[in-house]
Regions:
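Bacterial N-terminal signal peptides
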Residues: 6-14
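N-terminal secretory signal peptides that target proteins for export/translocation
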Residues: 1-2
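Flexible, surface-exposed loop/linker segments and immediately adjacent secondary-structure boundaries
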Residues: 20-149
Length: 149
């Protein structure tokens, strides 16, 4: 009995560390939006409103899709336009969005942030402290960053 109880207590103590970290939620979904979960090969999971986004996940939005993501800690919002593919990477001090192609409209809050925010493209890296900006990467790899004053 004591051995079983010790096992259960140990399991409960380490269970949160065994689960992937939920970093954001999908707050809007229209059309073709798919997840590729960390460790998976394809974008096979159809995205649903309220879906948890885990560290290491990726999202692809098709020609007729749109989505919006809200980070749980600082309420930063990413609006995802059609034909966009990107991934999420979180470390202790940095939040990175790896934009392969497409358009992200970003509202990065400066209040409540504990991590730096970066957008990484095939040719550039942009880091912001709190602003609204768009990150655009064409299918040929040309990128643009457009900020709002």
């Amino acid at each position: 009995m004591t051995r079983s109880l010790s096992f259960i207590i140990t399991l409960l103590l380490f269970l949160p560390q065994l689960q992937a970290d939920v970093v954001a939620r999908l707050v809007k979904v229209e059309g073709n939006v798919y997840f590729k979960r960390m460790g998976m090969e394809t974008f096979s999971e159809k995205a649903k409103l309220g879906a948890a986004i885990l560290n290491g996940d990726a999202i692809k939005v098709g020609e007729t899709g749109f989505g919006a993501i809200m980070y749980l800690d600082d309420k930063t919002i990413l609006k995802i336009r059609e034909n966009t593919k990107f991934g999420f990477m979180e470390t202790q001090n940095t939040r990175t969005v790896d934009l392969t192609h497409g358009t992200l409209l970003n509202t990065v809050n400066s209040e409540g942030r504990t991590k730096s925010f970066r957008i990484q493209t095939p040719v550039s890296v942009a880091s912001v402290k709190g602003t609204q900006f768009a990150a655009i990467v064409s299918q040929t790899g040309v990128d643009q960053f457009i900020g709002k004053e």
